[in-house]
Curated annotation (Swiss-Prot):
Keywords: Ribonucleoprotein, Ribosomal protein, RNA-binding, rRNA-binding, tRNA-binding
PROSITE patterns documented for this protein: RIBOSOMAL_L5
Lineage: Bacteria, Pseudomonadati, Planctomycetota, Planctomycetia, Pirellulales
Subunit structure: Part of the 50S ribosomal subunit; part of the 5S rRNA/L5/L18/L25 subcomplex. Contacts the 5S rRNA and the P site tRNA. Forms a bridge to the 30S subunit in the 70S ribosome.
Functional note: This is one of the proteins that bind and probably mediate the attachment of the 5S RNA into the large ribosomal subunit, where it forms part of the central protuberance. In the 70S ribosome it contacts protein S13 of the 30S subunit (bridge B1b), connecting the 2 subunits; this bridge is implicated in subunit movement. Contacts the P site tRNA; the 5S rRNA and some of its associated proteins might help stabilize positioning of ribosome-bound tRNAs.
Superkingdom to which the source organism belongs: Bacteria
NCBIfam families xref list: PRK00010.1 (NF000585)
A Pfam entry, by short name: Ribosomal_L5_C
Family membership: Belongs to the universal ribosomal protein uL5 family.
Annotated gene: rplE
Protein name: Large ribosomal subunit protein uL5
A molecular function GO annotation: rRNA binding
A GO CC term attached to the entry: cytosolic large ribosomal subunit
Protein source organism: Rhodopirellula baltica (strain DSM 10527 / NCIMB 13988 / SH1)
SUPFAM superfamilies: RL5-like
Amino acid sequence: MPNMSSNIPRMQQRYDESVRAALTETYGYKNVHQVPRLLKISMNMGVGAAVGDKKVLDLAIDSMTQITGQKPVTTIARKSIAGFRLREGMPIGCMVTMRRQRMYEFLDRLVSIVLPRVRDFRGISRKAFDGNGNYTLGLNEQLVFPELNPDKFVRPQGMNISFVTSAKTDDEAREMLRLFGMPFKQPKEKEQAGAA
């Protein structure tokens, strides 16, 4: 019988073996179902230039497909805005939702390969939580992903990556993502002194 553990993504193994235990010890959960877990990762690209040029949106869809391994859904404008020459129903972006194995594989690539390639990287913001344990990370350009060919993309395109967790508070979610290896900025000395 083949070894099934080799098919489990590295980040999922890390969660099962160390993250869950560390969170239980830190927060004193009584039940394993109380321990926060990562539910999904959503990637969103708003392509405002798609109003004038449809090829820009096709490039964004192609890049997102290469990055995630899934075909993205096209997002459309909900209302018309004359100043932007935007009409209701026009395609203006794309998004992908990753769950289970693809989610853990993407998180592994993001933490170990992509974030270290970001220019002048000093850690990700500790404040981008929504109050319900979810975190959103913004990237200025998609070319930090090694899957993409830089010659194919004329203009850099930014994206938002949202981590949806089952955590009740931002502190629990921050600790879980930190244990996964997310490189958060260290709190400034004023914040540390104010907390003490």
